[in-house]
From Swiss-Prot:
Keywords: ATP-binding, Nucleotide-binding, Transport. GO terms for cellular component: plant-type vacuole; plasma membrane. GO terms for biological process: phosphate ion transmembrane transport. It comes from Arabidopsis thaliana (Mouse-ear cress). The gene is ABCI17. One of its GO terms (molecular function) is ATP hydrolysis activity. This is ABC transporter I family member 17. Residues 29-260 form the ABC transporter domain. InterPro entries: AAA+_ATPase, ABC_transporter-like_ATP-bd, ABC_transporter-like_CS, P-loop_NTPase, PstB-like. ATP binds at G62, P63, S64, G65, S66, G67, K68, S69. PROSITE patterns: ABC_TRANSPORTER_1, ABC_TRANSPORTER_2. Belongs to the ABC transporter superfamily. ABCI family. The lineage of its organism: Eukaryota, Viridiplantae, Streptophyta, Embryophyta, Tracheophyta. CDD domains: ABC_PstB_phosphate_transporter (cd03260).
Length: 263
């Protein structure tokens, strides 16, 4: 059975994960010994090894500067990982055409960036690049998935709140029919109501489309709400992998301190 953690030397963690990972689940993403070295020689990521099962929402939390965003961006080659370190459905992503990869592995950032034109123009952007035309009904359906009604289709970015713009950016990403969603602090700039809307959409996408999701967040409450599994990252390493309900059981000293200060 594949686990979320593949460090053979840490038997206690592997045994614990028997109860965390769904039996028989296959990894959608496999990361093996992923390391990134900064220009000054320091290591941003230190041999990260993890399996992410298909259809799960994996939360990634930890102190600022611990390597969370670097890890996330390596999964769709926004940061180019070394060969044979990141695999999607068993295939080394460095061998996959980068445009095709980013269609399969979509990403949403902290601040939404919309293109000129209407909301509908934004949603159609990816399909248009592929020579595909989305009907109005298809646009409305994608907006609905992002918790926006059809009336938004004709609006421009200037008419939207930041929370609404973030949901348009999500609908635009969904138009590419991604198998995986990478979310880099997607609600940190949003008000509580908009944050709740995005969280509800994340859970809905898992239930309705089975999308595998990796979300980086500083909000413990958010991760406990949406995630199936939580990875705690400290100093470039995944030091704990727990169920959301078990975060209080973290044993790594820095992870414990982060959780205490964040709660």
């Amino acid at each position: 059975m594949p686990s979320l953690w593949s460090n053979e030397s840490d038997g206690s963690l592997r045994e614990h994960l028997v109860d965390v990972v769904v039996s028989g689940s296959e990894p959608k993403i496999r990361v093996h010994d992923l390391t990134r070295v900064a220009d000054d020689g320091s290591r941003i990521l230190k041999g990260v090894t993890i399996d992410i099962p298909k259809g799960m929402i994996v939360g990634v939390i930890g102190p600022s500067g611990s390597g969370k965003s670097t890890f996330l961006r390596s999964l769709n080659r926004l940061w180019e990982p070394p060969e044979s370190t990141v695999f999607l459905d068993g295939e080394d992503i460095t061998n996959v055409d980068v445009i095709a990869l980013r269609r399969r592995v979509g990403m949403l950032f902290q601040l939404p960036v919309l293109f000129q034109g209407t909301v509908a123009d934004n949603v159609r952007y990816g399909p248009n690049l592929r020579g595909e035309k989305l009907s109005d009904e298809e646009v409305y359906k994608l907006l609905s998935l992002a918790d926006l009604d059809a009336s938004f289709a004709k609006k421009t970015g200037a008419e939207l709140s930041v929370g609404q713009a973030q949901r348009v950016a999500l609908a635009r990403t969904l138009a590419n029919e991604p198998e995986v969603l990478l979310l880099d602090e997607p609600t940190s700039a949003l008000d509580p109501i908009s944050t709740e809307n995005i969280e509800d959409v994340i859970v809905k996408l898992k239930k309705q489309r089975g999308i595998t999701t990796v979300i980086v967040s500083h909000s413990i409450k958010q991760i406990q709400k949406v995630a199936d599994i939580v990875c705690l990252v400290v100093d470039g390493e995944i030091v704990e992998v727990l169920k959301p309900s078990e975060l209080s059981h973290a044993t790594h000293p820095m992870a414990q301190r982060f959780l205490q200060l964040s709660s």
